[in-house]
Amino acid sequence: MISIQQAEPHHRDGWERLWRQNIVNFGAPDMPDDVIDGLWQRILDPDHAMQAWLAIDGTNDDHTVVGLAHLIIHPHTFSLRNVAYLEDFWVSPDHRGGGIGGLMMTALQKQAKQNRAARKDGFPPARE
């Protein structure tokens, strides 16, 4: 069973494994460890705009992280409401095609709504 959860400290290893896959795929394989550490600290800081949402496979004992998304909720100049910006989205290649991306997008849409986002940037159009 797949669950979508906001990242917590114990998710670090699984998040980092997927994050490194993502940055290699998008051409930044040499990202320094201190940048990755700083990103993780931002994600865990409740006062920071950046959030990480993870797809967790609960069918095994280690609850493997199989998907990640970075969501940034921030103010903008055209409304007093926030904007939800989808910065990164990655599903482990060996878990693609099973609906995990759709589950994650549903959870991210819900999070944007809960944060009263006036607009959602970086979100792909819904697929049928």
Go through the PLM ranges and name each one.
Residues A112-P125:
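Conserved GNAT acetyl-CoA-binding A-motif
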Residues H74-H76, D94, R127:
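Short coil/turn motifs at secondary-structure junctions
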Residues I72, S92, F123:
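Conserved residues at the C-terminal ends of beta-strands
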